[in-house]
């Protein structure tokens, strides 16, 4: 798909300012340059960044409200969805403190570079979230292409506290993952079909208890 068409598609679903588009273009350029040596995203998606990565990441922004003060991206990787959300928040003047947690030092270096270049209100932490001894808290948590659902649920149940909602991006196997997880967990959630694929979903969890 032509880049101009991708940007138009992005703007049709996520209405943003010209300044936001400019910032996302800068992010895109930094990503393409760094990807040559760091393998941040698959080569098959390098020409689909605006739809495959930016739009897919941005689709949860309208479900974050003014009462949410913080958002934590677990296993941020190349910055999806955390950096995309941070760029939109900056230009919408949303006072949301965003935290990116990533265990790879190389990816952390890239994330910090983007944050500095775009002057984003983002904290980047080089940590393996599974090895952090203390519990962590925050209003909103997001994960995309991180770990299987059952592992994410166990992580959140054992280590997260005082959270309001968790957004989890699920692919083609998501329906079966939810079915299997519901055998062990009492999950209160809303499910939305992804705007980028009818075979994918985004779930918003607001309650999580062990059965």
Where are these regions (language model features)?
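Conserved SAM/SAH cofactor-binding pocket of Class I
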Residues: 58-139, 143
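A short glycine-rich, Lys/Arg-flanked "PGG" loop and its adjoining helix->strand segment in the class I
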Residues: 153-166
């Amino acid at each position: 798909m032509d880049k101009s068409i991708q940007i138009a598609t992005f703007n049709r679903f996520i209405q943003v300012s010209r300044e936001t588009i400019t910032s996302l273009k800068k992010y895109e350029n930094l990503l393409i340059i760094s990807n040559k040596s760091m393998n941040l995203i698959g080569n098959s998606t390098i020409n689909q960044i605006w739809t495959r990565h930016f739009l897919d990441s941005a689709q949860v922004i309208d479900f974050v409200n003014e009462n949410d003060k913080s958002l934590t991206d677990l296993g941020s990787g190349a910055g999806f969805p955390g950096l995309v959300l941070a760029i939109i928040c900056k230009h919408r003047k949303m006072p949301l403190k965003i935290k990116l947690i990533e265990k790879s030092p190389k990816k952390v270096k890239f994330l910090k570079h983007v944050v500095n270049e775009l002057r984003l209100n983002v904290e980047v932490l080089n940590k393996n979230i599974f090895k952090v001894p203390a519990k962590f808290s925050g209003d909103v948590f997001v994960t995309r292409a991180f770990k299987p659902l059952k592992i994410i649920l166990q992580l959140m149940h054992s280590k997260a506290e005082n959270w309001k909602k968790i957004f989890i991006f699920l692919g083609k196997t998501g329906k079966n993952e939810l079915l299997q997880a519901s055998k062990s967990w009492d999950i209160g959630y809303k499910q939305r079909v992804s705007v980028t694929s009818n075979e994918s979903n985004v779930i918003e969890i607001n309650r999580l208890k062990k059965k």
